[in-house]
UniProtKB/Swiss-Prot annotation:
Record's protein name: Esculentin-1a/b
Subcellular localization(s) per the UniProt record: Secreted
Keyword Membrane: no
Family of this protein: Belongs to the frog skin active peptide (FSAP) family. Esculentin subfamily.
Top-level division of the source organism's lineage: Eukaryota
GO CC terms, sorted: extracellular region
Job of this protein: Antimicrobial peptide. Stimulates insulin secretion by BRIN-BD11 cells in vitro. Shows hemolytic activity.
Any single biological process term in GO: defense response to bacterium
Pfam families given in the database record: Antimicrobial_2
Protein keywords: Amphibian defense peptide, Antibiotic, Antimicrobial, Cytolysis, Disulfide bond, Hemolysis, Secreted
């Protein structure tokens, strides 16, 4: 009924915002790792 529709919408929104946050976290980790690798390559410390 109406309740399950609302609950479904809320869950979907939570899931989407959760995935966005996870994506941001993962993205930041990838960026940081990339910067670390680039930095050690420039210094020749890899």
């Amino acid at each position: 009924g109406i309740f399950s529709k609302l609950a479904g919408k809320k869950l979907k929104n939570l899931l989407i915002s959760g995935l966005k946050n996870v994506g941001k976290e993962v993205g930041m980790d990838v960026v940081r790792t990339g910067i670390d690798i680039a930095g050690c390559k420039i210094k020749g410390e890899c």
